[in-house]
Amino acid sequence: YQKQQFFDDPILSSELLEEDPIGRYPQITFSAMPQLFSPAPVYFSLDSQYANFMRDEGTEGSRVDINPLLNWPMKLSHHFIFETQAGLRETAYLDTHNKEEGEDFDDNRILPTFRASLSTKFIKIFPSKSNSQRRYRHTIEPEVSYFYLSHEDQDDLPDYDGTDRIEQQNRFTIGLTNRLMTKLFLPDGSSSEREMFFVRAGQFYDANTSSQPFSNSFLELRSRPTDYLYLKSDLEYDAYDSEIEVFNGLINIFDRRGDYLNFEYRYAGASDDEANSKFPDITSNGFADTFFEEDP
């Protein structure tokens, strides 16, 4: 729940590009999926990025951002999963040059993080009434979590993008996930799976804020009711002002041959609405890769 924007390619406004045009040449990203780290169920993962920033005015230079994480999940009384995660995010700024002041410098930032969550899962598996070779699995997954990110003075660091200004976080989150999966057993013994419906809702409480500590309520929805239709949207609702602050909608339509059509709509508060249609490559959207194993 730390990331509330669910679209991979945010649209940059022309005003932003005109105010602070900046290039990244090159930008290299490396991520390591969670790997078992010890005999105990401790997993190691890594997100890292190198980028070299160039622009006509202001500060330019290179940045290395490394975020290693240790994750320790454990079962409690066969019904609950308690998970802890610790990280030490380090960001190094190299060969930094301020064109306005004519200064060269290097700097770095270290941000310890900690996360703990408690969750459970209610599961029901049932057959299809119209097809004996198909199974459905419905899960309801409530979760409460706590996330802490330490404070660090970042005023003297370069400001290239959102990575350079990360606010202190001390948050309690409550969320609920509702998921419907389907699995079809094929005559050759293989099977195919599809996530038909996914909806997640939640809200967090910021312990560092005395006024209006509750965040926007956020809702994420995605659905693939057929093999040729995919729907996705996310929404943020401001309970203090009683208004929708952010809404994004996406519709993908495609056929057996690989032709596809993409419709998008984006709304962000007082900014202008945006609607567009395009024909991008449609890639996997991270459907769940674990499922039940009953034979038909």
Residue ranges of model-derived segments:
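Outer-membrane beta-barrel proteins and related beta-barrel translocases across Gram-negative bacteria
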Residues: 1-296
